[in-house]
Amino acid sequence: DGNVEVTGTVSDSKGNLRSIPKTTKSANHSIVAADAGTLIATNSQITVQGSQMSVGDAVTILNNSGSSIVINRNSISLYNTGNGNNEDTSLGARGIATIYFQDAANAYISGSSLGS
């Protein structure tokens, strides 16, 4: 009937499929393919680069500081779903946002405390 039932943990190379793997970055970070499907906790600038991610990839950014951080674009269109603009943006203190990659050249960001 197409259903799969499992007793125990279902995992892949990044860990338990019911959890979002977390990495912590304390310096500026450029998103790379290995970041797909993860949460990046940071207090520093994030750069979203073109040609790094595949169709359907997603990365969540958690600003774990009391100040805004900058999310820059580099050779990619990054559309803020709050206003529809293709722009660099900021992520406010303790904010969280997810970036969805439509393809290698276009991504969408949505979340709390996004600015421009």
Regions found by a protein language model. Give the residues of each.
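Extracellular disulfide-bonded cysteine-rich modules/repeats
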Residues: 92-102
